[in-house]
Amino acid sequence: MPGNPWPHDMVITVDDDSQAVLDLLWVREAWELEPVGDDLPPRLAHGPARVSETVRADASADPVSWQQAWPGLWQATLAHAARPHDPCVFEALGRTDDGSPERRELLGRLIGPRAREDFGEPAFADPAYLEWTHARFQEHMLRRPLNAEDQPERRSLDALIRAWRAGLEKVVAIPCVGTFTRMLGPHTLLVTGETRRDPARYAEALAWFAESR
């Protein structure tokens, strides 16, 4: 379109609502886990209520092992988020049988690691999980820009274009406090929602990506 500053061939994917990421962040805070590891994310901007004592008393709940597994699962989840989309996986799924090992393997590649599988349903049994998920959805909808020009990528377009020319294809935003800007491989940038909503901070993060490449 004439006069549109967005390059016609620039495609940027923004993932600011990854259920795998949200589930991990919720479990960490609702269960008051204190995982130890390098480069773990900051706390949620709007944290959940603490899991009730009734749910904690469930014999199948194992927060000690969840705490130990959390850092590795976090890194695996980010690695999957940075992986480029492979349309061949969808095609291959259609040629597999329900319940077959091949189908499970392909689904794992498509969906990636999930806290529900690693921690089990007891980790999400508290009603606080649904309450927080609903509140998060409401907040996410309220924050949606009313027009394209108010989108964070549009408000930091110059920096975004430079980052795209340096290889950026995807931005992953997590609903955590403060600044947590990381490169997830050669084509993906991780930022907090706070950073993405602030044009100056977002431009700085995008510039850092471009300079690092």
Residue ranges and their predicted role:
Residues 1-133:
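N-terminal low-structure segments adjacent to metalloprotease catalytic domains
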Residues 25-28, 74, 107, 168-171, ...:
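Generic hydrophobic, helix-prone segments enriched in Leu/Val/Ile
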Residues 26, 33-38, 43, 82, ...:
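Generic alpha-helix signal with a bias toward terminal, lower-confidence helices
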Residues 124-189, 194:
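Auxiliary, metal-adjacent structural segments of Zn-dependent hydrolase domains
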Residues 191-213:
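Active-site recognition of the HExxH zinc-binding catalytic motif
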